[in-house]
Amino acid sequence: MPVITLTSDIGQEDFIIGAVKGQILSTIPTATIADITHYLSSKNYQQGAYIFNNAAKHFPKGTVHIVMVNFFQFPQEHVLFAHYNGHFFVTPDNGFLTMMLGVKPLEIVKINCKGAHTFIQITEKIVESVAYFLASGNMAEAGEPFTDIQEIYPMQPTLGPNWMEGQILFIDQFENVVVNIRKEEFDLHAKGRPFKIVFTRNETIEVLSKHYGEVPVADKLAWFNSAGYLEIAVRGGNMAGLFGLSKYDENQHNKQRPNDNKWFFQMVRVFFE
């Protein structure tokens, strides 16, 4: 049975997601459908990629991921259908594909959406193309080869000999703050040295915890979460709200001076001794 995931920024307050599921089951009756989320930001691609990737990687190889984010940023004359690392991805041609994967896949076809004007008309063409692919196992049945895609890539931490600087990419519902520094990057750069995590100018953390319970209630902590990313939090509190931290916004960053407090608060720095 084929597994198809749905991810979007649409929400679930109206009929759209239900209609798309109906299209899938009417065309591919054996499909198993799984929702990843329908509450991604339409503007913060890096945050959306973090959420999507850390769910999608747990699905079996062969899964088809239909990702509908910022769908109408450009006129949708086509959507992309790509293969990467055993998984298949359907996305608008708006840069989100490369933001998710971090690379441009070698295998990409475009699904022709000309003549489709509404969201449901476009998803009907998507589902038909996915069905052709699943029946044949050949991506050429879904569309024609295509390489001239929109490309946007995730920001990476900035590195110096004795420091790292990461951007806040996600704040969860408990206002725990996730930074785009992965454990393997941290360990490689730290080389076992003592460190100091610095944020909002005067706040520091000098120990990595294994879980929230390792510090007293109301104390701040840092750890590498289940996705392997650096997370700073306050046990029983709200880190982002208490310390004025906010998600990194590249557009806002470009409008601000480097010494602007808000710009600083979107960064987290690690210094090594």
Regions found by a protein language model. Name each.
Residues 2-5, 31-34, 63-66, 79-81, ...:
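Structural motif
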Residues 1-76:
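N-terminal glycine-/serine-/threonine-rich phosphate-binding loop
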Residues 117-191:
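Anionic-ligand-binding alpha/beta catalytic cores of soluble enzymes and soluble regulatory domains
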Residues 180-259:
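A conserved acidic, glycine/proline-rich C-terminal tail/linker
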Residues 261-263:
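Extended low-complexity, polyampholyte segments enriched in Ser/Thr/Pro and acidic residues
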Residues 8-10, 36, 68-71, 84-85, ...:
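Fold-independent oxyanion-binding glycine-rich loops
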Residues 63, 219, 249, 266-268:
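Surface-exposed loop/turn positions
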Residues 3, 27, 44-47, 60-62, ...:
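Active-site histidine-anchored catalytic micro-motif
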